[in-house]
Amino acid sequence: MKNKPYPYYTNEEYHDLKQMVYSKAEKIPYKPAFSFSAAKNAVVTKTFKDFCDDVEAFGTYLLANGYSGHTGIIGENSYEWLVAFFAVVNMGAVAVPIAKDLSADEIAQLIEKADCDAVLVSKSYADLVSVQDGIKLLSLNDIPTYINSGLERIQSGDTSFRNSQINADKMAAIFFTSGTTGSSKGVMLSHKNMISDTIFACRNFRLTGDSIAVLPFNHTFGLITAIMAQFNYEFCSFINKSTKRVSQDLLTAKPVGTFMVPLFIETFYRTIISTAEKTGKLKKLQTAEKISNALLNVGIDLRKQLFKSVRNAFGGNIEYIICGGAPLEEKYVKKFRSWGVYLYNGYGITECSPVVSVNRNSYWRDGSVGPVLKGCEVRIVADGEVLVKGDNVMLGYYNDEQSTAETLVDGWYHTGDLGHIDTDGFLFLTGRKKNLIILSNGENVSPEEIEARILNDDAVSEVVVYDDGGQIVAEIYPADGFLDDKPHFDSLIRQINDGQPKYKQVSVVKLRKSEFQKNATKKIIRYKVQEEQNNV
């Protein structure tokens, strides 16, 4: 579609998350807000009023029992997880979402690092949590019981939660960064940070129907972007509790849109192509793409009819997927669009609550991460680093004044990402400042730039480019069917090197038998690759 600017969307604005929850309960009390699979795959639906009432009741229970400090939340995505988070932050306390897939030692370290005096954990992960004396422990699975207790207090006249005052500028949550280059930092976000980013993002992009939440709630992309934005648009979000159930839940939820990280997109792409190959329909699919693209050029859109099987893999109603959390290859954007599913790439970081930019419904540019959000400022400094300023920028790192001072200067957050903005305002990312390969001749090489070119080949599943003794190495995890095809990759690298300055040319190609180690948001942990090399 032709890139043509169009007006920003208008949305309701709120002082804090508490006002947002109560506002929706009053405005659209009986409209579905969340749904999820329960016993025997029965689907349970909760309205906006149900959610508000449950949050108030659980918050009342917490206040009555002395829970008013820093509360850790550990568990799979669930309705109870959301009730817990909103109850804690909306009573004026601090929520500390913690990844469920960490080790017991790592969880203990984060609980201590965040000064938690209480922890809410689901039964599935209770064995991982060993709390010290003085730290209270509650089960997320028992929240329905706590809600009933809170309701009894409310019916007896307890208004402590409803009347609790929110200071929108104070810390409301601590989100831990994933740590692809080292230890996690605790990012302090306020109500103002989270609600501002939600409003900013909703000005740029319009959700058009029900969604499904597949990203972990302990990350800002999974919680603030996927849940709070959906909440703001007044659609229902189906809660996926496990990545093992994503395909099944898509068929149940039949979403119009969703939010995903690139790994999900890549997995679905490989599954679609693999299925077409196994059923002997790959040529038919490719022919349909050519016909469809030709018809689109003359204004005829038959994608819903031609690629029904592709859409059915996402439930049948899918129109768009907002993608972030890691770089998304341009080839996937174009391929899915040819099938009638729009991938809107965006850019976000935990420290910015998280969204900074996103491609818009009818205004996008392939290869970019979209226009910067209205209400958020971006500056590109001399060395190419992306700086961000706005009400969505964090308060700082918890108990880490040095890191805060290094990255937050005069209100500008130094992202560590490199990029540029084109004449139409689209932001393009080119790599990470810390990942730059600095050669002995003084030349700088962005490994991500080389990786992007290598990843355009369907034989490449994953790749990391790094420096080894002055030589640029491309370590590749091949796609199925290419695991031992070294000649293919040698030829690929020769093609990529052709026409590039000598200092940017890959000297060594390595193939690996297993995927690269990733963090909770499915980003490759680059320092682990370097550790592997040091141990060889």
Residue ranges and their predicted role:
Residues 34-65, 69-78, 82-86, 103-108, ...:
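Conserved AMP-binding/adenylate-forming core of the ANL superfamily
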Residues 40, 126-168, 272-309, 513:
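ANL superfamily adenylate-forming
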Residues 102, 119, 380, 390, ...:
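AMP-binding/adenylate-forming catalytic core of the ANL superfamily
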Residues 45-49, 172-198:
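Conserved AMP-binding A3 loop
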Residues 29-32, 155-176, 183, 206-210:
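Conserved pre-ATP/AMP-binding loop-to-beta segment of ANL
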Residues 195-210, 217-308:
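Conserved AMP-binding/adenylation subdomain of ANL enzymes
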Residues 462-464, 469-470, 494-536:
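Conserved C-terminal "lid"/linker of ANL adenylate-forming enzymes
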Residues 258, 302-427, 433-436, 450-451, ...:
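Conserved AMP-binding/adenylate-forming
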